[in-house]
From Swiss-Prot:
Its cofactor is Zn(2+). This is Probable M18 family aminopeptidase 2. Zn(2+) binds at residues 84, 161, 409. It comes from Clostridium novyi (strain NT). GO terms for molecular function: aminopeptidase activity; metallopeptidase activity; zinc ion binding.
Amino acid sequence: MKNKIKFANELLDFIYKSPTAFHAVDTIKKVLNKEGFSELKECEKWNIEKGKKYYMTKNDSAIVAFVVGNGEVHEDGFKIIGAHTDSPTFRIKPNPEMTSEQSYIKLNTEVYGGPILNTWIDRPLAVAGRVTLKGENILFPETKLVNINKPIMIIPNLAIHMNRNINQGIELNRQVDTLPILGLINDKFEKNDYLLKAIAKELDVDYKEIIDFDLFLYEYEKGSIIGIENEFVSSGRLDDLEAVHAALEGLTQSNVSKATNVLVCFDNEEVGSSTKQGADSNMLANVLERIVISLNGDREDFFRALSKSFIISSDSAHAVHPNKGEKCDPTNRPKLNKGPAIKIAASQSYTSDSNSSSVFKALCSKADVPVQEFVNRSDERGGSTIGPISSTHLNIRSVDIGTPLLAMHSIRELCGVDDHYYGMKVFKEFYNL
């Protein structure tokens, strides 16, 4: 079994290679290819075999990987872990170039998801995403990933001398206060297509070949292991790449079992999941049904398989805050490095119930992993996640769990080194059943 610190450093490497959902899927694919998985295309007929390993992608930003069990799928079902590839950030708008004070070059952006806005101020920022190029088939243009891994932007604060009330709290305007500066106007500056030309240079293509883009900002600096005893992981995008990384390790390092082991990494969780690659789609259901059909089953066999299946929906949980303990529930107070937290809500914003929670608790016991429970304060409205959304498309028992975090949706979130290791252990135990 891997050393905890080594595994945490592997997480930091994984996150840094994955500045966007597109890059996360690309990083996952590289791991899967190395581990002997074969890629399936949606447009092709699937001929899968028991004991073999496969994956398919959607929109370059979501992925489903699976190891076909050696049992009968309608009798042994699927063991599924779900997570998501996206994180709160800023998306660059079309025609983004702006000038200010006849001096600065700025980019026009919009907020993606629910970031803690002030944590993005005064940070060196880079840009990454997907670029669409002219192709031979007008309906299927060529796409390329781009990552300008340089500190090329920053969102500067307003000096306290010009904003005396800043330490009493101030609301940031998303159209005014959070636009990054890219540089200074000089004699060579041409406003039109300024960013496209920089992207084209990075990709070594003619900028006129670029039709469109999906580009996002990210913190340039890599995450780190911190704490007097190296207890913590400090990084952006822990929500939810921490779960993706732990589940990926669990899938690739587990044995073939009777059931078919599945890892699904959805996109767009942070904006509601209502996309073709999100949890509120038939993406996962279609993949599972195609697995059954390829194994010579029919639709009734598919429904039988679902009744024998189980989903662990893994999305970050809230740890009790050291300075704001009153924000946590009085009796359910997850702590860092005390194990994954089962997420429970009377509103059904989480899928956990006594049955599915008992399954996860038994798994943790078998893996020798501590387990906690998270419930919101009764006077606080919490978030939701992929679990209840995907449950509307699949009739499968499900539990919502997550690694406890501090500063969720900050540009730098915090989790426990032990907890990331615990997550991997229980996921591997689940897949080995």
